[in-house]
Amino acid sequence: VRDAYIAQNYNCVYTCFKNDYCNDICTKNGAXXGYC
């Protein structure tokens, strides 16, 4: 399961094109990691 998809409430719910951006915004929103 990739973090870019809503699969679990702690996963990244943002579609990301760059892993660093995804990780940054996801961790700010409480995810453990936001990498796709």
UniProtKB/Swiss-Prot annotation:
Per the UniProt record, the source organism is: Buthus occitanus tunetanus
Compartments where found: Secreted
Annotated LCN-type CS-alpha/beta domain ranges read: 2-36
The record's keywords, sorted A to Z, are:
Disulfide bond, Ion channel impairing toxin, Neurotoxin, Secreted, Toxin, Voltage-gated sodium channel impairing toxin
Q: Which residues cross the membrane?
A: none
What Gene3D superfamilies is this protein classified in? Knottin, scorpion toxin-like
Q: What is this protein called?
A: Neurotoxin 8
Check the record and name the PROSITE patterns matching this protein.
Answer: LCN_CSAB (PS51863)
Q: Indicate the family of this protein.
A: Belongs to the long (4 C-C) scorpion toxin superfamily. Sodium channel inhibitor family. Alpha subfamily.
Q: Does the keyword Secreted apply?
A: yes
The organs and tissues expressing this protein are described as:
Expressed by the venom gland.
Write out the domain note.
Has the structural arrangement of an alpha-helix connected to antiparallel beta-sheets by disulfide bonds (CS-alpha/beta).
